[in-house]
Amino acid sequence: MAPLLEVNDLSIGFGNGPSVVDGVSFALNAGETLALVGESGSGKTLSCRSVLRLLPDAAQMRGGSIRFNGAEGAVNLLSLPEKKMRAIRGDRISMIFQEPMRSLSPLHRLGDQVAEVLRLHRNMGRRAAKRAVLEQFEKVGFVDPMRAWKSYPFEMSGGMRQRAMIAMAMVAKPELLIADEPTTALDVTTQAQVLGLIRSLQAETGMGVILVTHDLGVVANMAQRVVVMNKGRVMERGDAQEVLGSPAHPYTAKLFAAAPMIPAVAAPAPASPKPAD
């Protein structure tokens, strides 16, 4: 069976400068978690945003292909017309971004923002969309889904906003989820809950997950395979436990020696929206 996603020889640059993503290749199977690991500026996020063609305006796609072998057939995402690409974003492929406050509108209630995904991609009416969103809110751990629906992002803590982003990414039941540093700025307990939530939703749906992180504890707990990046290039790839236990590349060994760890992933705990501290 073909991988769910195949990224081949991807190169991205800005202006006349050198490629900041240089010949990157990796593959992801359905139901699998692949971790992209590296320091800030290594090209992890750009590589992932290229899957959804959400690069900065000044970025140039210089080469490569991204093949998505989803349920509706295989496509090269880089050659699709923008109209067809819009139909894939947030539907068959979803992304959890690093900073929820930048991704959520401060002017609209959370429920309306998540329901918009279903109205856009599933052509649902307001009542059907609301039922589906409330169900998703319950799945991601909101004790009071209706309260979450009525809340504005600024009324929620960081952990609650991240749960909301997971709900938005998952409500259309994507085949592929990209999670870009999903636990950034969260306390250790909330980190474990968010990661446990992603893992439980993956077990339920069978989706593939690309997890962008610099935290080796996250890799050890979540990923089956790992790709290590530095300065836009792949340094090492392989089975996560093998690479963690015995890195082959000197850069990988150096990175791992300085990397932070977190406790094992806990089961997602129920939560309700509350004002941020």
Regions found by a protein language model. Name each.
Residues 192-205:
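Helical segment within the ABC ATPase nucleotide-binding domain
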